[in-house]
Each structure stands twice: as C-alpha cells, then as structure tokens.
Amino acid sequence: MKINIHRGAKEIGGSCVELESQGQRILIDLGLPLDAEKNDVIYLPDIPGLDGKDPSLLGILISHPHVDHFGLLAHISPDIPIGFGPAARRILKAAAPFMPGKWQAPENGWNYESEIPFEIGPFT
C-alpha cells in the first residue's frame, strides 16, 4: 500500500490523503485549506481522476463535515462516489443553501457507520 499525504501534514486544515493498493486508489478527505481566501479550484491538489476520467480512483471518503475536510468537493466530477457517515450527509444537505456558489451535497456514493467495516475495491 502507498500513502500520499497531499495536504494536512504540516498545516491545520485542507486535509487530503490518498491511499493506493493494487493499482486502485481512494482519497480520505478533500478539504479546503483554512487559510484559503475563497473556495477556488486553485486549491485542488493535482490528483489524477478528480475529473472522473480515471477509473483507478474509486471514491473519496469524508471523515467529518468540516469545510477543511470536504470543502473542495465542488470542484470535482459529480461521478466520483463520495462516502459519508449518515449524520454528515444530513448536515451537508442542510448546510448546502448557505455554502458559497451552487454547491450541493453529493448524492453519488455510500454511507458508512462507525465501527462497521466496509469494502471499496481492495480497501477494507
């Protein structure tokens, strides 16, 4: 397994970690840096597949509903599955009208429950 910390190791906020195994990848979080002046595509890490055209990116797991963990989802393909805890998905749907731009809580993806294993490709 390869682990690539794109952002969040030497800063608070903007978390984004990529896991790769057997040629398949998932991201844990895709957050907006706390020092970002606005939510802009310029903060999107250079990760293959965020345009939805690389099938090796299986999805993005969001750890919790803080903007520094999910804030850049507005700049990726809506075809990428997004994993949330059920409460986080409800919170983000409720918050969507107050988010900048035309941000909508992602519908594509899966829910996960605390302490219940789930599989995404080679990841458990």
Enumerate the language-model features and the residues they cover.
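Catalytic core of the metallo-beta-lactamase
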Residues: 1-6, 12, 16-21, 116-124
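Divalent metal-coordination and catalytic microenvironments
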Residues: 3, 19, 29, 64-65
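Short beta->alpha connector loops
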Residues: 8-11, 65-67
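A generic "binding-loop/recognition-motif" signal
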Residues: 66, 88, 114
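Short acidic-hydrophobic, aromatic-tinged amphipathic segments that line or gate anion-handling sites
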Residues: 106-117
